[in-house]
Each structure stands twice: as C-alpha cells, then as structure tokens.
Amino acid sequence: MAKQKTDPNYKVIAENRRARFDYAIEQDLECGIMLEGSEVKSLRAGGSNIAESYAAVEEGELWLVNSYIAPYEQAKVFKHEERRRRKLLVSRKEMADLWNATQRKGMTLVPLVLYFNHRGMAKIKIGIAKGKKNHDKREAQAKRDWSRQKQRLLKDHG
C-alpha cells in the first residue's frame, strides 16, 4: 500500500471510504458543522463514524443525517444524542448550488471526510455524487487492478 502524504493543516477524524466506491463524486465542498461541547471533545478523542450518513437540504438549511459521534465519557450532565441531525454551515450561494444539484435526477449529497482544520474548527467535506451501478463498480475495479499490474510489471522488468 502506498504512503499518502499527510497535510499538516488538518487532522482527519473520520473518512467515508465507501463513498468513492459507491458514488461518482462530481464536486466537493467544505462545510462547517454545528456541534455541542461534548461532541467536540468526543471527536478529538476519535469517536465518530460518517459511513452511513448523508446530507439533506430541508427548508433552506443543510443537515447531516445519521452521523455517529460517540458519547463523551467525562460529560456527566451535558451528554449529547449520538445520532442526532447536525446543521451544516454553508454560504447562501453554496446552499442554492447544493439545492439545485440535489434536484437533478439521481444526485445526492455524501459526506466524504470529517476533520479539524488548521484553526481547530471541525469541518466536513461534502460531495455532490451520483450512485454507481454494479457494472460501473466492476469497471473501476478492473481499471485499478490493471494499473496495479502495470506498475508491478514496470517495477519487475525495469
């Protein structure tokens, strides 16, 4: 497995690795996320999952639905709900673009990466995506296999 360069400007908390396999990502954008105090502490401890979540535009606002943030053990009184809907923060222009994108047939909003930026703010990268069919997934897998095989051949034979 090849090493990936790590960007010192942000720390990845959770990544939706299935998203790039299940969806064809057309465009992505960074959103802020409204969190409670215990949620931020839980994220810093690394307890989250965005693999089964999605974003939805409702009544002119963008929401992250079904994302999991583990309960923070030291929070006695102000505990948060693990799978509550969380509001995402985007500009009005970006909101209009997202709404127009979701109105097209087959388009959806998929969370890709949840991270802390260089200022320590929790951010989430949302992708405007179209679901792949099974044959598309097989084609992509075949291309990846072929490129790996080419790299091995070049490495072995010079």
Curated annotation (Swiss-Prot):
Primary location: cytoplasm
Xref: PANTHER family: SSRA-BINDING PROTEIN, TMRNA-BINDING COMPONENT OF TRANS-TRANSLATION TAGGING COMPLEX
Basic and acidic residues bias (residue ranges): 136-158
GO cellular component: cytosol
InterPro entries registered for this protein in UniProt: SmpB, SsrA-bd_prot, SsrA-bd_prot_CS
Protein name, as recorded: SsrA-binding protein
PROSITE patterns named among the record's database cross-references: SSRP (PS01317)
GO molecular function, one term: RNA binding
Residue segments, region Disordered: 130-158
Family the entry assigns: Belongs to the SmpB family.
Purpose: Required for rescue of stalled ribosomes mediated by trans-translation. Binds to transfer-messenger RNA (tmRNA), required for stable association of tmRNA with ribosomes. tmRNA and SmpB together mimic tRNA shape, replacing the anticodon stem-loop with SmpB. tmRNA is encoded by the ssrA gene; the 2 termini fold to resemble tRNA(Ala) and it encodes a 'tag peptide', a short internal open reading frame. During trans-translation Ala-aminoacylated tmRNA acts like a tRNA, entering the A-site of stalled ribosomes, displacing the stalled mRNA.
HAMAP family the UniProt entry points to: SmpB
GO biological process: trans-translation
Keywords from the named record: Cytoplasm, RNA-binding
Localisation per UniProt entry: Cytoplasm
A Pfam family annotated for this UniProt entry: SmpB
